[in-house]
Amino acid sequence: VEDSPHGLLAASRSRANVLRVDNPKDLTLEKITNKLNENKSMNIPKWQGGKMNVLIPMAGAGSRFQQAGYTFPKPLIDVEGKPMIQVVVDNLNIEATYIYVVQKEHRAKYNLDTLLNLITPNCKIVEVDGLTEGAACTTLLAKEFIDSDAPLLMANSDQFLEWDSNEFMYKMIEQKVDGGILSFHSTHPKWSFAKVDEFGYVTEVQEKNPISDIATVGVYYWAKGSDYVKYAEQMIDKNIRTNNEFYVCPVYNEAIADCKKIKTFNINKMWGLGTPEDLKYYLENYKK
């Protein structure tokens, strides 16, 4: 709570939420909550930390939406006037080279090259024809673009996060980690999970097995994309699967065994957009 001009200016420059009231008695919980909800849509500067790659696989079948009568593929479903993939990219809020893995049949039919380049100019597009043996295999289709010393961020194409990408990236660089996992608190076995030691370093990750209450969001950072490629290929060579698929999160176990430093970064909330029910819940509740 601040009413001096200097204090208000400092609060604004620090990107604090500022609520002006005429009288201290007017400072109610309802007004604070409403102001915070309004500020969810404020423009936060994009993270601009130099050369970086963001990889978004968007080649899933989206069968739940098809069964519910949706005619467009999931990444193109309208979410408050924007294709879902644009909502996801805007929410990541990171200046980078974007790389998308798309279904071959969708690329031409829906003019994905034009659309994705409008959302993220000069992006890279990789085709997949049909299904792979898991998300890790899908991401490696983009190996030619990510197998380098440039940082890599991988994200799901069907979720919305309440987070600050600047804060996350600053933390990753400040702590000089080799990898970072966005997380939230849950014990539901539909998620992936991370276990950490007393210093906050990840000691183990498990897919669909709640080894802790630190659930992973589905956004994964690697200080070097080449590390991800190396350890993903190593995991696949060892045939380490979950439910007969190669997942992305367990790749960190290979890095941890190689003495790489991995940390988690907790966010306020993750909103799923990946099913008709999740999308409906988001649209009805996010800005309430």
Give the residues covered by each predicted segment:
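Asp-based, Mg2+/Mn2+-dependent phosphohydrolase catalytic module
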Residues: V1-K51
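Short, charged/polar "capping" segments at the starts of alpha-helices
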Residues: L8, D26-L29, E105-L112, P189-K190
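Structural beta-sheet core signal
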Residues: R20, V54-I56, I99-V101, M154, ...
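Conserved alpha/beta core of the MobA/IspD/sugar-nucleotide pyrophosphorylase nucleotidyltransferase superfamily
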Residues: G50-V54, T203, A215-K288
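Short beta-strand-to-loop acidic/aromatic patch adjacent to the donor-nucleotide binding site
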Residues: D149-F160
